[in-house]
């Protein structure tokens, strides 16, 4: 009887009234989410002589919200060597919440022990990041470790071609940048032609003068007569007994045809001297020009004699390229190839400041000729700068010239990477010696990224090997789409996978959000589904209302649980992240950490105060 009355009560009006009233009371008393008490951040990790990087504070792993006792998300030293990529849209806090705080922590390492100070390379495109790095070093007593290359007041001179990098690698890098900046057609001929021309021009100048600049490449590319003269000069320099023709100045002025040959004035005798090539010898004999023939130990025009057997073989290679390849190309096509590189390299000719900083004369690197520093201070080799703990910054904003800034920055990056990788055999041969770490810090990384299966100096190859050289790569870019648009094909995937730690801030494009969601992985999640059905017996249509009615009706409700594999973080979550809020996929050097929410520490706020407290105060 009581059971029947209870079931009857479930379908009466008082039950629905009481149920609704209790639901309202419960909702009002609950007040939405459970409030959290005061947030107690643990002390920041003490500098105990071990290098580590504090990324931010960690609360709930998969949901946004505070807990009373959060933790710090910290990467130990071994995890730093595997690379950190910061990816976030404009205004999401990449620089203020990641790049500045990370640089502060790394450059402050070692304290007063100069042997532990970390040096490296800083690349950026805006022009303000370098000033922040200088301020960081000054605050920690390292003002003398800062080396800046710029176009305004820097005393340093940097020649991107003055190193021991292979000529093909340098040429390929220049050609790749030209094709990526000014058109990436499917026809590989143009990049191959640019690479071949620049490679042999570099070889030619290194053989003759032990020195080459971007301006030298431009002058030889646009002047076929000069190129021919230097090829002949290299042939002559490789002869067993080199000779020169000597004329009196009056004789030189009497024959106009002599002007087409390169002549120098002897500073002592004031006589005219020129390399005695076959063509010059033939001219002198045909026109009965009074001259003398002398053996010489040095070349006119600042060249050097080539005595090394390997270098003589290289001279023959240059000669074969010039006569059997370059001169056989149709003149129109040859002109197109030259124009493809000359319009860009000409910037080093018509801009005096560029020429002064990036194309210094050979005397700049001669301690005797440049004893008074009149040619500027040559930038020391990166291998020396790294071991001294110096921080090199290229302050060349893209606003001045985007393409040129990328070219110079990329060439400097390649030079730095080569110096870093040369540390690997040294470290392996002396494991008992503690070698200092080195930092590669790049803001707006998509402006400097180079990658590709055929690129001998691709970034993905460097990052895959830099761990052994104790290099810490930290880069920031606006989105995965930025890398995708800069690099060809699917090579961006190869590059992205070399960064084991990925910090995702707010993303504003669908592609990047989807890729970030996939990278964070999937997990088995319990999905709830509801099913409602209604049935009636002896159904009829009410004449007054037009609705279906039934004398006996029943409603059935069912609830089902299914296990599905779904993304841990949906793509929309990455678009909804607030400023200084991130989802981090970290790697500690041994094991990958699960993706988690992380609350970053902007450089202008007290890191000892919780993110949510700053948010409550309106600081974020």
Q: Where do the PLM segments sit?
A:
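P-loop NTPase motor core of the ASCE superfamily
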Residues: 189-195, 203, 340, 381-383, ...
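N-terminal pre-Walker A segment at the start of P-loop NTPase domains
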Residues: 41-73
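P-loop NTPase motor domains
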Residues: 33-35, 60, 66-71, 75-471, ...
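N-terminal accessory nucleic-acid engagement/regulatory domains that precede
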Residues: 1-49
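Conserved H-loop
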Residues: 478-482
């Amino acid at each position: 009887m009581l059971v029947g009355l209870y079931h009857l009560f479930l379908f009466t009006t008082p039950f629905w009234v009481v149920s609704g009233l209790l639901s309202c009371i419960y909702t009002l008393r609950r007040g939405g989410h459970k409030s959290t008490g005061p947030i107690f951040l643990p002390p920041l990790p003490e500098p105990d002589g071990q290098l580590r990087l504090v990324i931010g504070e960690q609360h709930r792993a998969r949901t946004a919200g505070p807990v009373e006792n959060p933790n710090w998300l910290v990467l130990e030293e071994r995890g730093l060597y595997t690379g950190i990529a910061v990816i976030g849209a404009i205004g999401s806090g990449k620089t203020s919440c990641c790049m500045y705080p990370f640089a502060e922590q790394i450059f402050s390492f070692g304290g007063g022990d100069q042997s532990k100070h970390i040096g490296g390379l800083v690349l950026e495109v805006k022009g303000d990041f370098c000033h922040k790095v200088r301020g960081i070093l000054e605050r920690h007593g390292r003002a003398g470790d800062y080396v800046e290359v710029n176009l305004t007041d820097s005393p340093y001179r940097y020649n991107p071609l003055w190193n021991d990098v292979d000529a093909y690698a340098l040429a390929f890098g220049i050609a790749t940048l030209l094709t990526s900046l000014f058109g990436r057609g499917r026809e590989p001929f143009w990049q191959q032609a640019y690479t071949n021309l620049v490679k042999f021009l570099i070889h030619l100048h290194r053989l003759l003068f032990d020195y080459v600049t971007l301006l030298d490449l431009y002058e030889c590319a646009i002047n076929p007569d000069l190129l021919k003269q230097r090829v002949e000069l290299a042939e002559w320099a490789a002869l067993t007994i080199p000779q020169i023709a000597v004329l009196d100045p009056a004789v030189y002025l009497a024959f106009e045809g002599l002007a087409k040959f390169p002549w120098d004035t002897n500073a002592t005798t004031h006589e005219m001297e020129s390399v005695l090539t076959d063509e010059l010898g033939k001219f002198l004999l045909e026109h009965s020009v009074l001259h003398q023939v002398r053996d010489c130990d040095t070349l006119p025009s600042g060249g050097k004699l080539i005595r090394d057997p390997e270098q003589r073989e290289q001279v023959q290679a240059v000669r074969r390229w010039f006569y059997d390849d370059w001169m056989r190309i149709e003149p129109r096509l040859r002109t197109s190839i030259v124009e493809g590189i000359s319009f860009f390299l000409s910037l080093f000719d018509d801009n005096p400041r560029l020429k002064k900083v990036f194309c210094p004369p050979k005397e700049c690197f001669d301690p005797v000729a440049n004893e008074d520093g009149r040619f500027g201070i040559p930038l020391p080799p990166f291998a020396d700068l790294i071991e001294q703990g110096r921080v090199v910054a290229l302050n060349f904003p893209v606003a001045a010239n985007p393409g040129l800034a990328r070219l110079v920055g990329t060439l400097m990056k390649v030079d730095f990477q080569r110096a870093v990788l040369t540390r690997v055999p040294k470290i392996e041969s002396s494991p008992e010696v503690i070698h200092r770490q080195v930092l590669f810090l790049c803001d707006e990384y998509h402006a400097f990224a180079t990658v590709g299966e055929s690129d001998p100096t691709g970034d993905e190859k460097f990052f895959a090997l830099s761990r052994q050289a104790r290099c810490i790569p930290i880069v920031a870019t606006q989105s995965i789409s930025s890398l995708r648009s800069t690099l060809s094909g699917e090579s961006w995937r190869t590059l992205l996978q070399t960064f084991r730690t990925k910090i995702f801030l707010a993303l504003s494009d669908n592609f990047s959000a989807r890729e970030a969601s996939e990278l964070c992985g999937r997990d088995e999640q319990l999905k709830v589904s509801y099913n409602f059905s209604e049935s009636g017996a002896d159904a009829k249509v009410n004449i007054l209302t037009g609705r279906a009615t039934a004398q006996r009706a029943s409603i059935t409700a069912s609830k089902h649980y299914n296990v599905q594999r779904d993304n841990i973080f949906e793509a929309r979550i990455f678009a909804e992240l607030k400023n200084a809020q991130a989802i981090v996929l970290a790697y500690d050097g041994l094991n990958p950490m699960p993706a988690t929410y992380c609350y970053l520490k902007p450089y202008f706020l007290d890191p000892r105060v919780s993110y949510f407290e700053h948010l409550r105060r309106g600081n974020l």
